[in-house]
Amino acid sequence: MCVRVLTSDVSSTESANMRIQTFKRVSLKALLMMPFLAFNLGQASDTNFAPKAQLVIDKVYAIVGPLGQRSVANAGLNANYGFVITENGVILIDSGASAHSAAMLEKAVAEVTKQPVRWVLNTGSQDHRWLGNDYFARKGAQVHALAATVQTQKASAEQQVSGMARFVGDQMKGTSPRQADVVHPGAEVTLQLGGIQFQWIDTSAHYPGDTMIHLPQKSVTFTGDLVYVDRLLGVLPQSNVRKANQAFERLRALSPALVVPGHGQVTNLAKAQKETGDYYQFLIANIGVAARNLDSMSETLDKFASPLQFKHLQNFEELHRGNMNRVFVDFEANP
């Protein structure tokens, strides 16, 4: 199925309405497949990726994936993961893109502790966040997710498995999409696992049901795909920059000392603000406002094509114009 990105000018209310209707006719299946169709972000840094745990703070670790596209070389682990070591076992944050890549994450954990993975928490519903669930569940781990996350996982499972197979091929063998054993209702949950407290907060930023996980005792937040650093974030058709901006304000209120972003190196809140929070605000204040004013789409995209504060980010040239396009169409349809 071909998904067309709209670029025509807005010269009248009639043409604006036609574009809105075209946008609304894009099927759910096409939207769920959009990450595979839209972006080609391969890079040399993917080559021979082996997950390695890096200490964030006492007993809390991050596994930082490469910034490029899913590939055989990175086993679909082009995202960030994390884990917390407790006396009762390991709490893993996100399970990987397949049974194969889940085993790679398990190996990275085993390099720093003999404790088994007892719990898995899914921060989101993109393939590399949860398609390793079954691997860990079959080994006795208890998988947790918020209800909204599970809903999106169920809707996208079939398309994500076939889509990931196009990138990693035979590495998908033995992978079964499996949702959480423990599903938590509501937009915010407080959990106590292995003596560690977790504040689990819905963001619905990059994907519906995306979340962030805050560890108040450690002053660390695993943001999921709310925050990107070192590379430009991607706005998908199902992304919601207004919710993302609100969720980022909640992150600011949590005021973590350390941030483990969805993509990019472990960082602090100031850098997360500069490379993600400011970009959400840029899109809303400039592209969103122009759409509400029924300004010309093409003129708006040209006007804001080269914001200096974001041009240094990897993937800027590939993603920025498409991001603006989707935000314009969204605000035009939902002013």
Language-model regions: role of each:
Residues D58-A108, I213-L215, S219-G224:
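Conserved beta-strand hairpin/beta-sheet module of binuclear metal-dependent hydrolase folds
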Residues S45-V56, G89-I91, A97-A99, Q151-F282, ...:
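Metallo-beta-lactamase
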